[in-house]
Amino acid sequence: MAAKEIKFGRTAREKMLRGVDILADAVKVTLGPKGRNVIIDKSFGAPRITKDGVSVAKEIELEDKFENMGAQMVREVASKTNDIAGDGTTTATVLAQAIVREGAKAVAAGMNPMDLKRGIDLAVAEVVKDLQAKAKKINTSEEVAQVGTISANGERQVGLDIAEAMQKVGNEGVITVEEAKTAETELEVVEGMQFDRGYLSPYFVTNPEKMIADLEDVFILLHEKKLSNLQSMLPVLEAVVQTGKPLLIIAEDVEGEALATLVVNKLRGGLKIAAVKAPGFGDRRKAMLEDIAILTGGTVISEDLGIKLESVTLDMLGRAKKVSISKENTTIVDGSGAKSDIEGRVAQIKAQIEETTSDYDREKLQERLAKLAGGVAVIRVGGSTEVEVKEKKDRIDDALNATRAAVQEGIVPGGGVALLRSSVKISAKGVNDDQEAGINIVRRALQAPARQIAENAGDEASIVVGKILDKDQDNYGYNAQTGEYGDMIGMGIIDPVKVVRTALQDAASVASLLITTEAMIAELPKKDAPAMPGGMGGMGGMDMM
């Protein structure tokens, strides 16, 4: 085991705080409508220009191991917020930095870290309740477009595209963002289906950067049972290889020798292939396999129907234009099933929804209906250069996630105003002075996002925050895009409650861990072994005794 270096108390916290500051300072410049760009060097290709907080955070790795631990903890805040809410990563980073800074000062002044944490938790719980009470529900397509526009850094067309996509496939429908072949950004709704099963082995991945497997013009084998060896499948595998097209296997499971053989064939390049587990369980799995069969024009290979794997021919396989498989989901786009068959299946599911008395069954049937009838909306992102397309795609992904979050939990005034207003409404009381200090830390930290937005726009943060708080109106705030004060919701500047809430909860959670840290352990750098001494010269002719 390698030797370790250990730092305690104040020394540890100072190192950690330095790491937090380096990462947060790089991320927070992207906040708000006048957020600046960050350029990220790539080992190959053009550098990447982005305003996406989580993309910046993911690139940061520091040389000093103790500083790096602090930076990685805050990076965790950004990714966790991104995973849950899909947006708000920069806000979460700014809040985490503010809470850690104030908390570290309080601990250095001799306060009890555990009481500070209790105070922080009390204040955060109250702010979350306040945000949920103030939330305004999203009802119209125009409101959806407004949320999308804000999250895409004020790009109105993006907001309109997202609103239209949600209108076409429903709020819970599947919307994907792809790179276009042209300079224009366009919206296309494609018949498709998504289910929550990912690839069985990461070796099936075709795009290592995003860790997804994309298969174009693909055959789909639907099998009801487990596959543990491929002997019985050889005839159909050989037939697929002859066509030169990829194959997706959807079965109860693919294990052992069968999975190993598929992986080896994929790696050797003989067979473009991927395997996923069938969605659902028991009878529902059978029904969902039937749904996929109807959507793709294939047949479920089932012993109930007397079909054996050995006798499967190409015409029994389903077909689709594209299948995209991530770690968690599989999306089948543009299956070649007959429209009349799909409509018949939809009518059948609707009839079952009418008849069922169980709420759970009804919910699952409605999910199946959405998958069959809803389709997949694809927003194709265009631009004149590859760098521009990538940057735009990041923003549209953020905007889409924010819009979904807004539909789920409602909206509050944007621009950091909701948190700013909550800061003066915190009435929680701690049982001692240290808990009170924890509550005050959150009060001050809640002003950080609004201050940062003003700073990024080149304005004096203290004046902006003072003016907003002087007016006793919940929606009154500062539009950094135009430099005007007024009703934020009226100006279309809004934040989804889910995004603001998640950002605050994640930031407080990680910041509390950092404040209550008393020791840090890291591996010492390995010392280079001393080089072997060179032989003595001029002794070639000596006789050995």
Swiss-Prot record:
Its EC number is 5.6.1.7. Keywords: ATP-binding, Chaperone, Cytoplasm, Isomerase, Nucleotide-binding. GO terms for cellular component: cytoplasm. Pfam families: Cpn60_TCP1. It catalyses: ATP + H2O + a folded polypeptide = ADP + phosphate + an unfolded polypeptide. It is found in: Cytoplasm. It comes from the Bacteria. ATP binds at residues 30-33, 51, 87-91, 415, 495. SUPFAM superfamilies: GroEL apical domain-like, GroEL equatorial domain-like, GroEL-intermediate domain like. One of its GO terms (molecular function) is ATP binding. One of its GO terms (biological process) is protein refolding. Forms a cylinder of 14 subunits composed of two heptameric rings stacked back-to-back. Interacts with the co-chaperonin GroES. PANTHER family: 60 KDA HEAT SHOCK PROTEIN, MITOCHONDRIAL (PTHR45633). Together with its co-chaperonin GroES, plays an essential role in assisting protein folding. The GroEL-GroES system forms a nano-cage that allows encapsulation of the non-native substrate proteins and provides a physical environment optimized to promote and accelerate protein folding. Belongs to the chaperonin (HSP60) family. This is Chaperonin GroEL 1. The lineage of its organism: Bacteria, Pseudomonadati, Pseudomonadota, Alphaproteobacteria, Hyphomicrobiales.
